[in-house]
Amino acid sequence: MNRKLLLVFLVVAMLVMQPAEAGFWSKIKDFAKKAWNSPLANELKSKALNAAKNFVSEKIGATPSEAGQIPFDEFMDVLYS
């Protein structure tokens, strides 16, 4: 096969596949966006946030508002000790 013909074939294939792949990835992105903003996902995110806050408050022995007043270095020392 001639090199120039192979190059033309590859360029045409790239031009044809690029819109097809773009449509495929946009559908995946739309589905992920709908799933992320769904009521179930919002409920799970809020539960995870509350669990993280409770873990930190139990670990450092302070309420979340008190934990906000602790300097970062002391906060990290308490978490990893």
Curated annotation (Swiss-Prot):
Listed Pfam families: Antimicrobial_7
Role this protein plays: At high concentrations, acts as a pore former in cellular membranes and causes the leakage of the cells. At submicromolar concentrations, degranulates granulocytes and has a weak hemolytic activity against human erythrocytes. Also strongly inhibits the production of superoxide anions. Has a strong antibacterial activity against Gram-negative bacteria but is less active against Gram-positive bacteria. Also has antifungal activity.
Domain of life, source organism: Eukaryota
Tissues where the protein occurs: Expressed by the venom gland.
The keyword tRNA processing is annotated on this UniProt entry: no
Family, per entry: Belongs to the non-disulfide-bridged peptide (NDBP) superfamily. Long chain multifunctional peptide (group 2) family.
Full protein name: Probable antimicrobial peptide Con13
Intracellular or extracellular location(s): Secreted; Target cell membrane
Signal sequence range: 1-22
Paired cysteines (S-S): none
GO CC entries: extracellular region; membrane; other organism cell membrane
Record carries keyword Ribonucleoprotein: no
Residue positions assigned to the propeptide: 66-81
Keywords of the record: Antibiotic, Antimicrobial, Cytolysis, Fungicide, Hemolysis, Ion transport, Membrane, Secreted, Signal, Target cell membrane, Target membrane, Transmembrane, Transport
GO biological process per UniProt: defense response to bacterium; defense response to fungus; hemolysis in another organism; monoatomic ion transport
